[in-house]
């Protein structure tokens, strides 16, 4: 049975042929592309639906290329994909996420997802966090719908090898707040990561993430509506993200400490409170 993906952030020049070629360049074959247009003006609404042979193919494509550079796009853009479930209510089942650290630059979303889903079927997605230039920050998230599998993965995959060239570092990521907003019309499956807290021994380190710089859900009543009607979009930039356990350069820290200490010593020596010659010396009057 055919299945579709939603694709957003399109430029007006991106027609059906452009989208099909972009997927083909990434090694993916699509059955059809439907560009959504305003039914009154005929102007593209900025998004489309891409049809695949079956759900498995669509899901594989989503995890493989979502967030990667879009071939031929000017200015440069990235694939922005999401699941589509026409007329169905959103899946509000609980989600259990893990923070994955010490990722090497070669690890992408698809590799992160495949590493976990082959052992833990409830894994629903993986996201490697990128900086503004598209380079990995060295960490990401994986999401599960089964809490037991999340806990198993945390224990069984801690320090595991096979994902990139370094052992992975795992910790539980807890959603900061579950925000369920009422959306009119039919609703689509939300494939997103919200804000998380990362708990370690003595502190919380906070970061946020949205799928490809955004967490979105959208409704689709009929063709011809504008994009603002179809999609509610919430921006949370990647610049708010940071590794909760950065490496400490002890040598550099000691150097800075000594430099600051020398500055303090010099300042004290230059002030008017000079040491006395002897214990019995008279204390000079203040000027």
UniProtKB/Swiss-Prot annotation:
GO BP annotations listed: selenocysteine incorporation
A GO MF label: tRNA binding
Cellular compartment(s): Nucleus; Cytoplasm
Alphabetical UniProt keywords: Cytoplasm, Nucleus, Protein biosynthesis, Repeat, RNA-binding
InterPro entries: Nucleotide-bd_a/b_plait_sf, RBD_domain_sf, RRM_dom, SECp43_RRM2, TSAP1, TSAP1_C
Keyword Acetylation set for record: no
SUPFAM superfamilies hit by this protein: RNA-binding domain, RBD
KW Iron (keyword) present: no
A cellular-component GO term for this protein: nucleus
Domain RRM, first and last residues per copy: 3-86, 96-175
Pfam families documented for this protein: RRM_1, Trnau1ap
Principal place of residence: nucleus
Family the entry assigns: Belongs to the RRM TRSPAP family.
Protein role: Involved in the early steps of selenocysteine biosynthesis and tRNA(Sec) charging to the later steps resulting in the cotranslational incorporation of selenocysteine into selenoproteins. Stabilizes the SECISBP2, EEFSEC and tRNA(Sec) complex. May be involved in the methylation of tRNA(Sec). Enhances efficiency of selenoproteins synthesis.
Assembly behavior: Component of the tRNA(Sec) complex composed at least of EEFSEC, SECISBP2, SEPHS1, SEPSECS, TRNAU1AP and tRNA(Sec). Found in a complex with tRNA(Sec). Interacts with SEPSECS. Associates with mRNP and/or polysomes. Found in a complex with EEFSEC, SECISBP2, TRNAU1AP and tRNA(Sec).
The protein's name in its UniProt record: tRNA selenocysteine 1-associated protein 1
